[in-house]
Amino acid sequence: APSDELRPEARVGKWLQDAHGWWYRNPDGTFPANKAVVIDGATYRFDEQGYMRIGWVPEGDTWFYHDASGAQVSGWVQDGGSWYYLMPGSGAMAIGWVKDGESWYFMRPSGMMMTGWVNDGSAWYYLSPGSGAMVKGWVQVGSSWYYMNPDTGAMMVGWVKDGSAWYYLRPGSGAMATGWLMDGGSWYYLSTDSGAM
C-alpha cells in the first residue's frame, strides 16, 4: 500500500499558526523564509524566521503592502490617514507621477499621495484636496483663480486665451489678474467679475 506521504492530499502546502504568527509549510515539508512566495494566486512575504509579514514590507529599495490576510495588495491603500498607490502587477509602491484611469496623481518619495500645490521640478500643478487627482483648466484656490494647462495640468502664467476671452495670469503666483493691468507698456482692463479682457 502507498504511504500517506505519497498520496496527493498529503502533498499540499498548509498554513500553520503559533503564538508568533502564521507560516506556510510547502508540500515538500520546507518553509519559505526571507522571501516572497505565490500561494493560491496571491503573493506573501515571509521574514527570516519564516513568519508571514503584514503591513509595509521593504525589498531592496522597493516597498510592498500586505493586508491583514498577508496577501500583497495592489492599487490604492489607505494607511495611517494617507493614501498610497501600489502598482498593478508588481505591487511596488509608486513614487512620483501615477496615472490611474484618466487621472494623474503625485506620490511623495515616502509614497504618500499629495494634495494641493505641488512642484515636480518642471512646473506647478494643483491636485484636488478631496481626491488628489490633477486639476486641469480653471481652479479656485482660496480667493484666487488659476488656469492649469488643459492637456498637461501645468500652471500657466502670462496671457492665456480660453474660448473667445483673454486672461492674464500673474508670473510668479499664477493668480488671475482683475482690474487694470499694465503689461509691456500698455494698459488693459480685466473684468473684476470674470477676469476676462
Question: What are the functions of these language-model segments?
Answer:
Residues A1-M197:
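Extracellular adhesion/carbohydrate-binding repeat motifs centered on closely spaced tryptophans
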